[in-house]
Amino acid sequence: MTAEFAYLNLTELRPEGWLLDQLRAQADGITGRLEELWPDVGPSSGWLGGPGECWERGPYYVAGLLPLAELLDDDALRAKTAPWIEWTLASQRDDGFFGPAHNRDWWPRMV
């Protein structure tokens, strides 16, 4: 049986035209500036090691920001994702658990 669809890496696709315009507007708008506008995804986020919100807001923010950065090949947006990813990877403990220590729920880690 042949596959109906082929798997592609995100970077194998490049937006053009209307879609590129929409993604650029997103990057230049709220998504690209959300940490300036919403404290829950700012420097005090629990997902950056701070005392703030540690549920799903940070992970969802990064889950949208990283693909946007890759689709636009935008180093400034990539730089915004780096602290989130680096902190999350560095937060892994001896038992394998990762993320904010004061929230042991798995849900925000599955984003």
What does each model-found stretch correspond to?
Residues 65, 90-98, 105-111:
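Aromatic-lined, polymer-binding surfaces characteristic
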